[in-house]
Amino acid sequence: GKGYDGDLVAPMIRDIGLGLAMGDTSLDVMAANLGKVGSNQNGGWDDAGGRDLHVGAWHVGVLPPTAPLPIASVTMTGLAFAAWHQKLERFQVACIGEGASSSGEFWEAMNLAGARGLPITYILQNNQIALDTSPIKQSGVEVWADKADAMGFPAWTIDGSDPAAWYASTASAREFALNGGGPTLIHVETMRGCGHA
């Protein structure tokens, strides 16, 4: 991937492929992921850089993930607001899990995005378990994409194991946003084989 020049993404800690899609190198992604010397992430022990599973690459628009997952939605909504206010042609992507979609921060972010028509998509990855809570005990909605209805913007569900669906969905969301359509939510149905981390 060459990514999209100027666009910004906020991945979750396991979203290594998103950095590659935006144009980061395999070496940089692995150095950051493993906390090795040469990482483009600051910190670590003895300037080793990075932290396990926390990758980011500012030079290609990939923000470092945050451990509290809902924060990405707020950060990216703020950056989308700045882009909208400055009339920049820039698209923002905030990745969160289904558990994070029950947080107040996420709802506040979506409310602002919907009210202002901000150029952002929220990728809600439903891996069937938030820390240790099953989806049926987290929310009253049966289809997680329905959460966007309350904020007045479109959403759809894709199969998380289908790379073509990922590409087509994010490309559609980007085109929609940059043509003035506003925010979207992409609900990704996937499965994690075990509990947290």
What are these regions (language model features)?
Residues G1-R116, S134-G140, A145-G152:
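Cofactor-binding active-site loop characterized by glycine-rich and histidine/acidic residues
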Residues G17, Q128-L131, R192-C194:
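Short gly/pro/ser/thr-enriched loop/turn and capping motifs at secondary-structure boundaries
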Residues V29, F176-A197:
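Glycine/aspartate-rich loop-and-adjacent alpha/beta segment that forms the canonical ThDP
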Residues S101, S161-A165, R192:
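Acidic, metal-coordinating catalytic cores used for nucleic-acid/nucleotide bond scission
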Residues E105-F106, Q125, G195:
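Short, function-defining helix-loop hinge/capping sites that tune catalysis or transport
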Residues A115-R116, Q125-P183:
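Ligand/cofactor pocket segment of small-molecule handling proteins
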